[in-house]
Amino acid sequence: MLFSPPLQRATLIQRYKRFLADVITLDGTALTLHCPNTGAMTGCATPGDTVWYSTSENTKRKYPHTWELTETQSGVFICVNTLWANRLTKEAIQEDRLPELAGYNILKSEVKYGAERSRIDFMLQADFRPDCYIEVKSVTLAEKENGYFPDAITERGQKHLRELMGVAAAGHRAVVLFAVLHSAITRFSPARHIDIKYAQLLSEAQNKGVEVLAYKAELSATKMELNKSVPIML
């Protein structure tokens, strides 16, 4: 997926109030960007890092510029806009880049399901096959080459795993897909040191038939593409 129009470059001064970030552009202009990430963003928002941002054509937006990528001072790319995890996953499914999810001719988004009244990110359907429910999670927390999710305790994520176990018990396919949006990560694990309950639920879910996938995106300031399976260590 190409960034169109091209992203613009700036230097990060600070992220604050979760949804805002101050930057300095190449010509020295000070801007405040919208930060579309509610997580801790550990390692993704170090002052002095390069920020790549987009600009909305909507003139009514209070903050028309959106922080899309971080390029660290060591050259690592991280996608901080969590909306891209679903966009890249959808594109990869439609282009048959995820072999585990190939062979379906109908793709639906934000379908209501489950005992806890959730919405699944994607549902795949095809004749003579069980429906496939897919929950997507964005992975940006890294320690060396290890990627972790979540980066903070996530009751919502725990709920999604319970819902997926219900889907599997009903005879459908249930999938949690971890979209790795950090160029230095080469393997994935649940973040036991942050949310032990989520890690325990993920292991339980896998034992009860939920499929656990992890795919990494190729990242640059011009394009992103989810295309590489990475090892999972539960």
From Swiss-Prot:
GO terms for molecular function: DNA binding. Pfam families: SfsA, SfsA_N. The keyword DNA-binding applies. Keywords: DNA-binding. Residues 201-220 bind DNA. Binds to DNA non-specifically. Could be a regulatory factor involved in maltose metabolism. This is Sugar fermentation stimulation protein A. It comes from Salmonella arizonae (strain ATCC BAA-731 / CDC346-86 / RSK2980). The lineage of its organism: Bacteria, Pseudomonadati, Pseudomonadota, Gammaproteobacteria, Enterobacterales. The gene is sfsA.
